[in-house]
Amino acid sequence: VDTTQLLKGVLDLAVLAVLRAEDGYGYDIMRRLRAAGLEEIGDASVYGTLRRLFNAGLLTTYVVPSEEGPHRKYYALNAAGRDQLDRSGKVWRAFASTMDSLLDDRGVAA
């Protein structure tokens, strides 16, 4: 099953959720998403999502010097980002619950 369209619909929420636990730079965020099970996530999708969330006022950034190469731009949730995560998380949970019910009622195995 091609999950590309599903990922597009939930990538903002996934990035916000990853940043709830800890600030991160682009590659680190992508690595954490993949480790959580979103292996198909592309680099461009993650970086584009970070830019979009920042431009929407949901993230702040800061630069940290790195001894292993160029400085790293870290992303962090701000108050608006936490509010958006809470709202989107509630919508997602309700949607997922509805889909679970539909699949269970039709005898579709989990």
Regions from the PLM with identified roles:
Residues 56-70, 76:
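Beta-hairpin "wing" of winged helix-turn-helix
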